């Protein structure tokens, strides 16, 4: 099973992936080549994303998925949906060169690549189990920004749960998004 973990910054995604692998050692972590590209090319992230960086990250996320096959036991710390959410935020805020045309170029790639994911676990911000925000590597620590990203994920997750529709995934062949 190919599992993706998604959500805003500082919500415990990597911790969940690490704990999951300890509990179920037959699962492997994806290559996460996008992290290497971010570091190697010093790509802009979070509030400073731009088309060039988001395009490179999206393609790395897709490449990692394409290296797998149906039946592989792999867990992804982030997926193309994450990339699209961050791009949507930037387009909405008009904080960079990311525009509607760029979003429209990305959506078909996200739709196609998400078909290869069997299930998406979304880790939302909750009052019941708050996660301490820690400065680490390229992590964003602006609480308002983190909440705004979380809200975009929640709209996607709740809309899909209520209507069965998600404009960023194909209708007939998409993974469920399960909020945990």
Question: Can you annotate each of these PLM segments?
Answer:
Residues 5:
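Hydrophobic anchor at the beta1->P-loop junction of P-loop NTPases
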Residues 10:
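Walker A (P-loop) phosphate-binding loop of P-loop NTPases
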Residues 13:
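Conserved lysine of the Walker
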Residues 21-63:
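Conserved substrate/cofactor phosphate-moiety recognition/catalytic segment
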Residues 16, 20:
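Hydrophobic positions on the alpha1 helix immediately C-terminal to the Walker A/P-loop
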Residues 58-101:
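A basic- and aromatic-enriched beta-loop-alpha substructure that forms the phosphate/nucleotide-
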Residues 86, 90-161, 172-175, 179:
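A glycine- and Lys/Arg-enriched "phosphate-lid" helix/loop adjacent to the NTP-binding pocket
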Residues 2:
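Walker A (P-loop) ATP-phosphate-binding motif of ABC ATPase nucleotide-binding domains
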């Amino acid at each position: 099973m190919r599992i993706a973990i998604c959500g805003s910054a500082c919500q415990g995604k990597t911790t969940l992936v690490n704990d999951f692998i300890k509990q179920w050692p037959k699962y492997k972590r994806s290559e996460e080549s996008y992290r290497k590209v971010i570091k190697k090319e010093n790509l802009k992230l979070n509030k400073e994303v731009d088309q060039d960086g988001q395009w490179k990250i999206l393609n790395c996320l897709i490449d990692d998925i394409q290296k797998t096959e149906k039946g592989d036991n792999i867990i992804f710390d982030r997926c193309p949906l994450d990339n699209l959410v961050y791009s949507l935020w930037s387009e909405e805020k008009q904080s960079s060169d990311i525009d509607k045309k760029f979003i429209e170029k990305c959506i078909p790639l996200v739709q196609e690549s998400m078909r290869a994911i069997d299930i998406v676990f979304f880790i939302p911000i909750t009052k019941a189990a708050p996660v301490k925000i820690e400065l680490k590597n390229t992590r964003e620590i602006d609480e308002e920004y983190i909440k705004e990203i979380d809200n975009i994920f929640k709209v996607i997750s709740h809309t899909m749960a209520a209507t069965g529709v998600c404009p960023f995934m194909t209708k007939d062949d998409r993974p469920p998004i399960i909020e945990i």
